[in-house]
UniProtKB/Swiss-Prot annotation:
SMART domains: Molybdop_Fe4S4. GO terms for biological process: cellular respiration; Mo-molybdopterin cofactor biosynthetic process; nitrate assimilation. It is an enzyme of class 1 (oxidoreductase). This is Periplasmic nitrate reductase. It comes from Aliivibrio fischeri (strain ATCC 700601 / ES114) (Vibrio fischeri). The keyword Signal applies. One of its GO terms (cellular component) is periplasmic space. Disulfide bonds: none annotated. Residues 41-97 form the 4Fe-4S Mo/W bis-MGD-type domain. It is found in: Periplasm. Substrate binds at F794.
């Protein structure tokens, strides 16, 4: 090969730079340098694929492959920063075991539940699925099919799934994995404010005087937001950081005060703070009188277990979300027992420390930002706990103004934008509407051009009940998309795996990798990831962000959206609706679900010419499907406090926080002058409630369903670590992240280790009546539990720690408590 002098100089310069950086260039690197077309990296924006922070990244592509990512300096969320996971986004799609063709369990050339996985065509895969779905619908009706989706679905994927299940199959048995992470937050938002999602935004980080973390390790789980807290704390000496947790973690390193409390006693701490505010005349009476009402929650509501479970049978008011009106004096009386002494006895936190925390809320000059994630939400009284923190902010009027913000952080990139806003929960419809409300069903049927009575008014099976119905043979056809519930969910051995392997059931898993869930399924569908498709996410501060497809998917992988739409083509309306309903819309006779749901003159309203050249989903359908779905979905919220901008706008900005009215985003909701829906002269307007008033809800401490005993004498808490995300499906396939933290460990207090004759690195058996796992002990490091508690992260597929978790839920939100269950620790010889 001949080289020009200029090319030679460039090649040597590149080699020199590589040598300085300690990198060895391949021999063919000079070829890349000679060809300017090949060396040119194309950059475009996209929201990060990981957590709910919503960082924007710049994605570099070359020769049809993502080769680099970097923090987006124009992004207001992360301002050019990435966390360690974000820096390796370019590698998440290129794991060696990427599934690239549909895989069906086969024996002797036919589907067989006990067969081995074998590659099949998409037509065979989808035709087999359709056959199983039709059989389940014929046997059980709409309740015989189910879908478990994701807070990682794009907005369009989730919306298409809702239409397919709720309008097409007329089944409300669709739920997202956000049920495991955000359902308690949703429940409390709806009870307290009548509308979902935070009233504040990330600008609060630069305005608060005090930060209080209630069960959130932001240093590892939301590290980019943690940098904003760190900057505020280190730049302003008066700012205080408070961290409450059941064990010591990295967020404590910045904290001015750390509070280690007994599991479940956060209920007592929050009630104490409310009592302290009242007893010390710190109630903002002007705010309380104008903008709040008082309610009493129904108590002794059980734990969301099966109806025949003894714990559930003991409850006086199982699963009741009823509330009764009370006066302020009655509320005052309800929190009066929670004195500093009582709360200290219950929590293990000193009276002095409890008062230190309460004073920050009570001081009218201190702007307080409360933050929480799974520690509060994954809780058998998670809705109550969320509400108790809202009570504190409402009593003091510290809400919906810069720096005063009770803020529920999300764990997935579109738990807000897709699971919550789109309404992929079993009881919801888009824009905070619910299936149980006839008016909401009528609105949805009108927008979707469905005959009256199409939508089912009974909420469907939520995540935990879906497992039980599969086990009991009541759901026979089930589709898992964009999650790994066989590793992430609770009580795997007893309630989940039996349903997957039930001979009556057909389980489909759409995933890019052979996860634990995929391996337990009957059909694996290879899925396009992240920038292999066009989409949109919604983050924790109500910011909607969109991105274009930037590379093509590996092999035969297809997006979840393509899969949903192609599947819908295999059902004629007569096969799923029944004659009575079809008779109301005779023009639909002979049409497919695809024709009715996605070729309805709205979803297909935008021509292919409007889409980018690289848009495989649009090309497959022959129209700009992402824009059509988004605009139809957005029509639910416009004019109703959930306004989204036109779809094309999101491709020109780094996201906008809804409601977006007249092109302007909203930073603080409910506050006059900031929120366009707040009435003039109202000052604050909680317009989700008919009278514009938020609720202060009294709820007591109630014990968890299980506590340690003589046999199972330790608490187990499960969660995450910085380097891995959820079940590690993506991060464990990034070599640098895998090498950094290859294995899950059992973090244990040195005194507990000594009692059991354990040393760091010893292998132990963690067990209870639901199962056992083998894991190595860690007595040092980032996580330091108190005596009596161990922490084990759940990213490691070889250590299915969540099999030990009881499938008890908050009866109101149906969210599982992954933060506390009794276990015993035994040394393995």
């Amino acid at each position: 090969m001949k080289m020009t002098r200029r090319a030679f100089v460039k090649a040597n310069a590149a080699a020199s730079a590589a040598a300085v950086a300690g990198v060895t260039l391949p021999a063919s690197a000079t070829n890349l340098i000679v060809s300017s077309d090949q060396t040119k990296i194309k950059w475009d924006k996209a929201p990060c694929r990981f957590c709910g922070t919503g960082c924007s990244v710049l994605v570099g592509t070359q020769n049809g492959r993502v080769v680099a990512t970097q923090g987006d300096p124009e992004a207001p969320v992360n301002k050019g920063l990435n966390c360690i996971k974000g820096y390796f986004l370019s590698k998440i799609m290129y794991g060696k075991d990427r599934v690239q063709t549909p895989m069906l369990r086969m024996k002797d050339g036919q589907y067989n539940k006990d067969g081995d996985f074998a590659p099949v065509s998409w037509d065979v895969a989808l035709d087999t699925m359709a056959e199983k779905w039709k059989a389940a619908l014929k046997k059980h009706g709409p309740t015989g099919v189910g879908m478990f989706g994701s807070g990682q679905w794009t907005v369009m994927e989730g919306y298409a799934a809702v239409k397919l299940m709720k309008a097409g199959f007329r089944s409300n048995n669709i739920d997202p994995n956000a049920r495991h992470c955000m359902a308690s937050a949703v429940g409390a938002f709806m009870r307290t404010f009548g509308i979902d999602e935070p009233m504040g935004c990330y600008d609060d980080f630069e305005n608060a005087d005090s930060f209080v973390l209630w069960g959130s390790n932001m240093a590892e789980m939301h590290p980019v937001l943690w940098t904003r807290i760190s900057d505020r704390r280190l730049s302003h000496p008066h700012v205080k950081v408070n961290v409450l947790s059941t064990y010591y973690h990295r967020s404590f390193e910045l904290a001015d005060k750390g509070y280690i409390f007994e599991p479940q006693s956060d209920l007592a701490i929050a009630n104490f703070i409310a009592n302290y505010i009242i007893q010390n005349n710190a109630v903002n009476w002007d705010f309380v009188n104008k903008h709040t009402n008082f309610k009493q929650a129904t108590t002794d509501i059980g734990y969301g277990l099966r109806d025949d479970d003894p714990l559930q049978m003991e409850a006086a008011n199982p699963n009741s979300g009823a509330m009764s009106s009370i006066s302020f004096e009655e509320y005052k009386k309800s929190v009066a027992p929670y004195t500093a002494q009582k709360a200290s006895e219950m929590s293990g936190v000193s009276e002095e420390d409890l008062i230190t925390l309460a004073k920050q809320y009570a001081d009218p000059k201190t702007k307080v930002m409360s933050l929480w994630t799974m520690g509060m939400n994954q809780h058998t009284r998670g809705v109550w706990m969320n509400s108790l923190v809202y009570n504190i902010h409402l009593l003091t009027g510290k809400i919906a103004t810069p720096g005063n913000s009770p803020f529920s952080l999300t764990g997935q990139p579109s738990a807000c934008g897709t699971a919550r806003e789109v309404g992929t929960f079993s009881h919801r419809l888009p824009a905070d509407m619910v299936v149980a409300n006839p008016k909401h069903r009528a609105i949805s049927e009108k927008i979707w051009k469905l005959p009256e009575g199409t939508l089912n008014g009974k909420p469907g099976a939520h995540a935990v009940v879906q497992d039980r119905m599969l086990k009991d043979g009541k759901i026979n056809a089930y589709w898992v998309m964009c999650n790994n519930n066989m590793q992430a969910g609770p009580n795997i051995n007893t309630e989940r795996l039996p349903g997957y392997r039930n001979p009556e059931n057909f389980i489909v898993c759409s995933d890019p990798y052979p996860t634990a869930t995929a391996q337990a399924a009957d059909l694996i569908l290879p899925t396009a990831m992240w920038v292999e498709k066009e989409g949109a996410y919604g983050n924790a501060e109500r910011r909607t962000q969109a991105w274009y497809q930037q590379v093509q998917a590996k092999g035969e992988a297809k997006s979840d959206l393509w899969q949903i739409m192609e599947f819908s083509k295999r059902f004629k309306v007569e096969e799923v609706w029944g004659e009575e309903l079809v008779a109301k819309a005779p023009e639909y006779r002979g049409k497919t679900m695809y024709d009715i749901l996605f070729k309805n003159g709205q979803v297909d309203a935008f021509p292919l010419s409007e889409a980018q050249e690289l848009n495989d989903d649009a090309k497959a359908q022959g129209f700009y499907v992402q824009k059509g779905l988004f605009e139809e979905y957005a029509s639910f919220g416009r004019g109703h406090g959930h306004d989204l901008a036109p779809y094309d706008t999101y491709h020109t900005v780094r996201g906008l926080r809804w409601p977006v009215v007249d092109g302007k985003e909203t930073l603080w909701r409910f506050k006059e002058g900031s929120d366009p829906y707040a009435k003039k002269g109202s000052d604050w307007d909680f317009y989700g409630k008919p009278d514009g008033k938020a609720l202060i809800i009294s709820a007591p401490y109630e014990a968890p369903p299980e506590v340690p005993n003589d046999e199972f004498d330790m608490w187990l808490c499960t969660g995450r670590v910085l380097e891995h995300w959820h079940t590690g499906t993506m991060t464990r396939r990034v070599p640098e992240l895998y090498k950094a933290v290859p294995d899950a460990l059992c973090y244990i207090h040195p005194a507990d280790a000594k009692k059991r004759n354990l040393r760091r690195g010893d292998e132990v058996l963690i067990s209870n009546k639901r199962g056992e796992v083998r894991v190595r002990v860690e007595t040092r490091g980032r996580n330091r539990p108190p005596e009596g508690l161990v922490f084990v992260p759940f990213f490691d597929a070889r250590i299915l720690i969540n099999k030990l978790i009881l499938d008890a839920t908050d009866p109101l939100s149906k969210q599982t408590d992954f933060k506390k269950c009794p276990v015993k620790i035994t040394k393995i010889a």
